[in-house]
Structure formats: structure tokens, C-alpha cells
């Protein structure tokens, strides 16, 4: 039997036996060893199998294709090309190849939609393309698909019917729309932009222009915003289906573009003006989600911005911090956000200023700087104590000025006696006791209970948070080194139940500085079966792990953020696979024995004994939790275990020493419910009993709340989807009600649905138009002489949403549009001076930190050792990247739009000046600041299967394949679990609905309420 024949038999058997994705991957390894095959032949075999089955929709098919892509066996471009070859889109229109006729009776569009959407997801998340060649190949595949869909439209036009053509088939509309989104997503990637920006791909751009010219007129009926987006793409890269009218013969000298040098030399810079909105935006960006505060980076930025003018620097950063608080109050931001802004002002800035004073030889009149900054504030927003009784409005910020001044006095920036004069009245509090980090460390070493007392004070507004954070993190490091886990457990418990304390910690330490020692301790945890009592060991291990998980889920941290550098790390394995169950035959002998022991302890014996725990280390237990739940729930669903017995066994996991394992158990359970199409009643009852337990201890209740915080958002999204599929169910709402108080746990910079709808429906052009409008308001505010005027409404979530949804290139283009407009107005003397303010604001936006790129930016100030750690990488195109691309394009841009080219050059110069390396900082020793003031001190894969022996005779091939498939199916049945690859997967729960949400959320009519929390962030 030929290789395609063997593969055809294998794939047919997989589909017939409903082999799930995990087992399919394992079987693929065997097949590739036994029978190598090219990617085109492999896809032909798979798609021909689909045609033979005559099934209109089989969710396994796109799942198998996705597995092949993820394993690197096939490329996205080849998938799209092969998919088109066998697509029923050719029906009643001229087929591209004869092969299509063979399946003309089969209906493939539902599969086509799903595969195209999977390709779009891979592109939007950075999975592909990895090379220029692959990007070009995907562009050509999209072009062919567009022509096929347009041909289908014309062949189905019937003027006697309405609607006709494209609009007569919802599935064809979905294919059409998905292709447009895929094209937009690909064009927003780094490789896609390189292809479209280069001069060497003229043939591709001509064909792409022809495809767009055919696509855009039809797109008006489908989605006007998508049409506008692709129209902008066509205009930006001149994709009109015709060869370029002229080639640029640019003179080169030693690989340097002479025209570019000449043009840039002719561009004159205007005066450097520090807009009030600049630092206002920068601080918003630092604190909008995970606190992105790195002292070296901040000092460097401020020193570059202000040079040696420290008085101006201090006055403006104080003013900006108060402006941020004022804006948050008027925007009705959450109390959690208000707390973080307030802590930055009161707890972060005073010691930060003290560090600057200690490191510079320049005398800085702090009292004058602070007085001038306070004089610029709106008295209605920050009233004095006496004014509080006269004001009818909001006085939530009445204490802030006083708190800030006392914190400054505590850090010796101003004398205590000057506070009354600066406030204009008698203060209503006394000077707090100032803390010293080293003294606090000594106190904790003497009395470990002092640590919890100090943690209680982290959230206070007395200017001591920095010293407390420094002491606590140093103690944690020491305890990790000494493996003193009893005290460490208590500290971790105190921190994990205080989410706001985690925010404050990141004002002074990076996540890596805090978590790397903890992850190292968990990875190297020593387990001795004869060590005596085991429950306390499980308790200590779980408490330390729970703090790591709280940080990870609150701030959406990546392994590099946690300080994990080894692929063998237990924590890494747990984060990647802890919520995935395993088949029984995939477990080794020790794992099988441990699983049986735990099942017996939970459901048969009187409880969890010391023998149960002594035979299984905490690391082994946590990696088995999902499988334990899978087997137990599977037994209950098949009638082998009573539900009351199941519930009683699961309740043992509510004991404090096992509670952290529920993070992975609930994650698995949520996925199982989402994947279970026919009847999820038992799983929902189990979930309700764990989310809302009937009884739990006081200590357990605190840990349980932290567990729910980490999983609530994911569970809510899954339950919403299940409720949509089963609207008559009444057992879902009680669970969602219990989760509701925990939904605000994350701080990742995502916007709210109401915000997104307001921006995307903006009359001036959707989300981009709203960003431009906000930019205009910030420039106007900076130019206004009324210095006490309240700041305009602003949240950096708007810019982040633009970057994640539309792409940095389009957001950057909108900023440049505004700069060009203001430059034109300046030349006509209608808006003199505003263009320089706008340039400063735009440069600050480009320099502002972004969570996706923060590790890369930090690496320029704190380089990692490449021999020990992988260099950090950024998964999205940032505003800095977009500026760099535009700057490279200046020679061509100067010929078509000289004014725009000038603006890009000026902006690039300003950004380069603001981001100049630390060595260029005058009169400021950054290392001394960091060291002296203790600010930011650095302190297994998929299952392997044995390959087959010598190749069997052809006559035995089919029998061998059948036996292999039968064994896999039998193993799946023996495991007693639903693989989640039934008909329900992909129907109403996958990208079929969220594709519309992507479009609607980005300039569209309706948005997904949790859109920015999805994995599709950054698609455009």
C-alpha cells in the first residue's frame, strides 16, 4: 500500500473511532516514523477522507488539521491551499482543479470556516508566520480564496431573488468575512508588514490589489467597518492591482540611503516643550494594569526628558500623579484602581525623590517644588479638611494632600513644621513613624510574627510601603535559601489573601525578583517518605504555590516573568499541564499507584491518611489532580460512583492543606463542562459544591477565596457559553452568582465592555477616531493657560485596546495624522505652539510601557545572562516598532508626503532622545539610586512512544493501522472520560461566534463583554 493509501486508512479510522486530539498526536508520531509523507499529500489524504464520509460537519477534521499545524507537520499556507482545492465553494462556478469535482456533492463550508478561523487565531497570536516566505505564501493563499468566493458570488447572482449572490448563503458570508479578518490580521504582523513595505514583492502586491478590488465592493453588504479597515490597508500600501508607476532608484553609499540622510538633515526640530499631558499619560500607562514600574527605566526616562532640571521634574511628576488621581475619581474608577494610584503618589514618590536627592550633587528646594505642584491642583478635587464641610460633592480625595506631605516629611524631604503652612490649615494627623528596611528585617528575624503585622501595613498610606516590601522580600529570599518553610508559609498566606498588597509590591519589586526564589524552592522541594508528619508539608508547599498562582493569574504573568528558565521546572510543567488530565495508559507505574491510593482515600476509606500522603510527594499530587478529577467524575457520569460519594470525596480537597489544588481541579472541571455537549448536570453539581461549599473552616475560607479569584474569570466565560447553549438550565446562575465577587481580581489593562462600545461607536471613526479625539483633548488641555483646570478624561486602556485590536501600526498612523494636522495649522498660524506640545505627547505615548513588551524593555537596563536564561521576546508589534518601520520608510514617504515624513523624523528623534541609554544621563548615578535607596534591588513534553520495528509488509499495513486505532479507542473508553472532541466542540463555543466579536469590538456595532480578556488579544 502506498504512503497516501496508508495515511488515508489511518485518518479514516481516526475519524470513525472519534480519536481525540491528544491521542491523535501520539498516533501521528508512530505514523510519521512508519510512513513518511509530504505535507501536501498528507492534507490531500485527510481532505479526501472528509469527502468520502459525506458528513456536512465533523469537528474532528479542523481539530486534526490544527494538531498537524501545531506539531509543525504542515504550514498554514499549505493548509489554506489544500482546503481550497477540495472546497465546495467551487460548486456551480469554475473549479480550480479537477479534484474539486470529485467532492462536488459534499458540503465543506462549515469546515472551511473553522479552519480559516484557526489560521486567523494562529496569525493573531504570533504563531505564524515565522518567516517572510511563509507570510508571502499565506498572502497568495488568501488571494486564491478571495477569487474563489467572488466567483461563487457572481455565479449565484439571481436578479429575480433578493438577496442573491453572496448574501444568499450565511456560510459563504462567514467564509468571506473570515478571509477579510485573516488578511487584516496577517497585514498587522511584523512579517506581514515587512512583505507589504518591501519593494521586492511587486507581483504579490499587484495580485493582492486585484483581490482587494474584487473584495471591497462586496464587503459593504457584509461589514462596513471591515471594508473600511481593508480600504485603509489598500490605500496605505497602494494595493490597486497595478505595477508601481515608478521605481525608486535610491542612491546608496556603504549601505546607507543617501536620500534619507539628506532629507533628515533638512528637517529642523522645533523647541522641546514638556506637555502637562505627557507625564499624565505615562503614569497612567505604568499603572493601568500590572504595575510596570522599574526604577532604572523611570529615572532614565525622566532624566532624558528634563535633563538637569530636577525642580521641574519633581514638580511635574507630582502634578501628574495628582492629575491621575483626579481623573480616576471623575471617571468613577474602581476603588482598587484608586488605591493603586494613591499608593503610587504617597508610598512610591517620596522615597523615589529621596533616592534622587541622595544621588545627585545638585541642591533641590523640595518644599518649593511641592508647593508649586500643589498650587496647580484643582481645589474642588483635593479639598482641605475645612472645605469638606462646605462641599456637597465627592470628597474621597480630601486626605490625599495631607498623606503625601506627611510621607514627604517622613522621608526627610520637607520639615514637619512646614506641613501646616503648605496645607493652609492644621493637619488632622501626626507624622507617622518612618521605617527602615534593615531594621524591619532584624525585627522579623527576632519575631517572625512581625512579618504579618507589617504585611497588614503594606496597604496603609504612610510612605512606609517601600521599606516593608523590601524587608518582606528579603526575608522571603532568605527563607527560601534556608528552606525554612514554616515561616515562609505564613508570609505567603498573608500575601495571597491581600490582592492589593500584590499591587503595592510591584511598585517596588519586579515579579521576577519576588517569585523566582519561590519557584526555585518549589522546583527543588525535597521529599522524604520517612520524614514524619506529612500534612504540614503539604500545607507549606500549597501555601507557597498559591502565592505564585495568585501573582500569575492576577497579572497574567508569563514563565519569564516568574523567573522560570528551565524546561524541567516543576512550576512550568504545572502551569502548562496541571489542568490537563491524562489517559491511564499514559501514566507510569508510580503515577498509577498514587492515583489509585488517592481515589481510595477520597471515596472508599475514612479519609486521607498519613500513608496516602507519604507515598506521594506534593509535586506528584498536583500533577495528578486533573486526572484524579477526570477519573472520579467519569465514574460518576457512567453510574459507577454515586454523586453523594463523589461530593463527599471532593470535600476533602477543601481542607486547607489541599485547597490550592482546586486551582487546577476547577480549571479542568470548567473545561470539561464547556466541552460536554449533551448533559453536563453532574459536572455542574460538582462545580457548585466546590465553588459554594456548604461548610468550610475559617482558615480554609480565606484560601478558598484566593482559589476562586484565580479561576473565576475563566469559569464565568465558560459558563456563559454553556448557558447560551442550554438557556433553560437553572443550575448555572447560582454558580455565576458565587463567582461574581471574584471577577475583578485580574489587573491586565483590559477595558470594560461599556468602554469598548463607547469607543467603537465613536462618531469620528470608531476606536481609532476615539483615540484621535482623546489625543486632541490632551493637547488642548496642555495648551490651556488655566493650570488648575481638571484633566480631560483618559484611560490608557483605550490605547492598549487599540494596539491589541487594531494593531500598533494603525494606532501609530492615527497619532501621526494628528501631528500632521497640527503641523499644518501651525504653519497657517491658527494653532501656534500646539504642534510641539502634541509631539511631546505622541513621543510619550510611544515610550509608555506596555505589559507585552515590558520584559524586553527591562532587559536593556537589567540584561539577562543568555547562557542561563532565554532573552525575553515581545509577541506584539508595539508603537516603538511601528515608529521604526515608518522611519525606515522615510525616503519613499518624503517623495509622496514630505510633511508627514518630517513629522515622522521629528517624532523618531524625540523618542530616541527620551529612550537614550542610561550612560547619557547627566549628574545622576542610577546605580547609586538603586543600591543606596533599596529601590528595585536585583537580587516533560508530550508523551513519547517507542517507534515501530522494521516496516511490515504492505498487506499488513491496514491491519496494523486498524489495531493501532482500536487500541487507542479502547484506551479512551477504559479511561472513562469524555475527550471533549464530540460534535459540540466548535459549535457555538469556538471562534464561530467570537470572530464577529473581534470585528464588532474593533469599530463595530456590538462587542464581546470580555473581549480583551480572551486569547485573541492583539489580533489587529
From Swiss-Prot:
The main place the protein resides is: nucleus
Q: List localization entries.
A: Nucleus
Task: Enumerate the InterPro entries for this protein.
Answer: Mediator_Med5_fun
- Provide the alphabetized UniProt keywords: Activator, Nucleus, Transcription, Transcription regulation
Q: Name one GO biological process term.
A: regulation of transcription by RNA polymerase II
Q: Which Pfam families match?
A: Med5
Q: Cellular component GO terms, alphabetically?
A: mediator complex
Molecular-function GO terms, alphabetical: transcription coregulator activity
Q: What's its job?
A: Component of the Mediator complex, a coactivator involved in the regulated transcription of nearly all RNA polymerase II-dependent genes. Mediator functions as a bridge to convey information from gene-specific regulatory proteins to the basal RNA polymerase II transcription machinery. Mediator is recruited to promoters by direct interactions with regulatory proteins and serves as a scaffold for the assembly of a functional preinitiation complex with RNA polymerase II and the general transcription factors.
Quaternary data:
Component of the Mediator complex.
Q: Which family does it belong to?
A: Belongs to the Mediator complex subunit 5 family.
Protein's name according to its UniProt entry: Mediator of RNA polymerase II transcription subunit 5
What's the source species for this entry? Aspergillus clavatus (strain ATCC 1007 / CBS 513.65 / DSM 816 / NCTC 3887 / NRRL 1 / QM 1276 / 107)
